């Protein structure tokens, strides 16, 4: 997630001077049927049997796994993990509705967690996938848990990177909502975002604690990923996405019956730590078999910060027989790397 973007007040004067015409992006009826930029890893695909058009990238061999990005992110947020997971899974890396090359439904879609969840289940139907692993980050983790709660027979396992059953309160995007809800100002903000001038600022915000410790190559790679988040931004869609955490209801009762194994990954240095701790408490009380893993130096977007460690955890949890290919991320005695803490349930699964 992009948490502090709306607080970049030092740029407001420049925003107001921008031409708003550059902020116009095609909506559903005008959506492109080909990606703006081809996938660097995998094959671009589009759904064909749904009312709205969803874009995804397909790569790999093995049991199916769907990767669900965060709120304003695209499938490219998983770019650093795709080469690590592709030898072990048939991966479907999504652009959620409203992001990347997927459609931007308007009047008939609110971008809530359940709506995005239904889109993914429809995609599974179209691809004739009866059951699969769901890997989601942040908003994508919320969607994954929602599917597991509402469609229990469609989910074999869930890997949730700082997602939630209990939404963050107050919404971290309330200031963004206010800005985007004003047409002239909102179009100017989106124009500035799409210009690329804020890509470095946004990358720093996303990476937070980890940014100063990254080398130049990693920073450039993350900035490139972020640039694909922002170049498809539109005012109405990003306004709806910003509202999504407020308009999506907690699904605490439904989640109590989740039967699929769940691995919950979090970072102690995350800017959403309060939200993750609230949800960790919920899991401990109502879903004690959820495997909880915390990275001591981890941020919110572990898929960007720690792709190899995260991929290794996913393999060890979902497909332990395949995990030896990433054994370099663990010590020879089979214990987790230093800086990782986990509950007893996961220790038993990990050894």
Where are these regions (language model features)?
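Conserved alpha/beta-hydrolase catalytic His-Asp/Glu region
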Residues: 170, 192-256
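Conserved HGGG/HGGXW glycine-rich cap/lid loop of the alpha/beta-hydrolase fold
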Residues: 52-103
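Flexible "cap/lid" loop of the alpha/beta hydrolase fold
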Residues: 149, 158-192
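Short glycine-enriched nucleophile-adjacent loop
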Residues: 141-152, 158
